[in-house]
Amino acid sequence: MEKLLCFLVLTSLSHAFGQTDMSRKAFVFPKESDTSYVSLKAPLTKPLKAFTVCLHFYTELSSTRGYSIFSYATKRQDNEILIFWSKDIGYSFTVGGSEILFEVPEVTVAPVHICTSWESASGIVEFWVDGKPRVRKSLKKGYTVGAEASIILGQEQDSFGGNFEGSQSLVGDIGNVNMWDFVLSPDEINTIYLGGPFSPNVLNWRALKYEVQGEVFTKPQLWP
């Protein structure tokens, strides 16, 4: 009995905190919810002065309402990093509570690949959609992003690790979520978009530490 209990405890811990190779897989959020999400664990030890985030997602919500794509909160700032879709506008990108917009003239229902980067030294933001760059913009020059973070997929955090609204939740698939603590070059982003090799050092989809809450499923990815 003691051996069985020990096995169950170890299995539970492995599910919550162990590393998983998520290659060719995606998290599926099948319905609107304020309780379903995925929490990602990142080995950050110091504040970020630059970063790049790349991922795939697939949803039918874009012409209906806004939704959160990537939410990185700290105890001082719930929108430390936020990638959000704003209906009738396009992509909203936030660092340290300050927001800029990248308009999308036409919305189609198809898997989308995005990469976005920011650096403190210049404040320059780059935003790439399906391998194509938008015009560079500037945001929060001189700012540093906190390291003690709650990173959530599927919900927007209005407080550290919680206070979700179902009307901002993602309904659909998300995968290939990777993050670096530096700005990737255009050639590197193009390589990632085409499926080439990469070595993320903050979040690595091929060695992902995560915990699922609520109704979220892991399924084969639907994009190439």
From Swiss-Prot:
Keywords for this protein: Acute phase, Calcium, Disulfide bond, Metal-binding, Pyrrolidone carboxylic acid, Secreted, Signal
Disulfide bonds: 54-115
GO biological process: acute-phase response; defense response to Gram-positive bacterium; inflammatory response; innate immune response; negative regulation of lipid storage; negative regulation of macrophage derived foam cell differentiation; negative regulation of mononuclear cell proliferation; opsonization
Keyword Calcium carried by entry: yes
Annotated InterPro entries: ConA-like_dom_sf (IPR013320), Pentaxin_CS (IPR030476), Pentraxin-related (IPR001759), Pentraxin_domain (IPR051005)
Compartments, record wording: Secreted
Modification Pyrrolidone carboxylic acid, positions: 19
Domain Pentraxin (PTX) intervals: 23-224
Listed PROSITE patterns: PTX_1, PTX_2
Molecular function per GO: calcium ion binding; choline binding; complement component C1q complex binding; identical protein binding; low-density lipoprotein particle binding; low-density lipoprotein particle receptor binding
Domain of life: Eukaryota
Free-text cofactor note: Binds 2 calcium ions per subunit.
One GO cellular component term: extracellular space
Positions annotated to bind Ca(2+) 1: 78-79, 156-158
Secretion signal, residue range per the UniProt entry: 1-18
Tissue expression notes: Found in plasma.
Cofactor: Ca(2+)
Main localisation: secreted
Family the entry assigns: Belongs to the pentraxin family.
Further remarks about this protein from its record: This protein owes its name to its ability precipitate pneumococcal C-polysaccharide in the presence of calcium.
PANTHER family assigned to the protein according to its UniProt record, in alphabetical order: C-REACTIVE PROTEIN, C-REACTIVE PROTEIN-RELATED
Subunit structure: Homopentamer. Pentraxin (or pentaxin) have a discoid arrangement of 5 non-covalently bound subunits. Interacts with FCN1; may regulate monocyte activation by FCN1.
Record-given protein name: C-reactive protein
Species in which this protein is naturally found: Homo sapiens
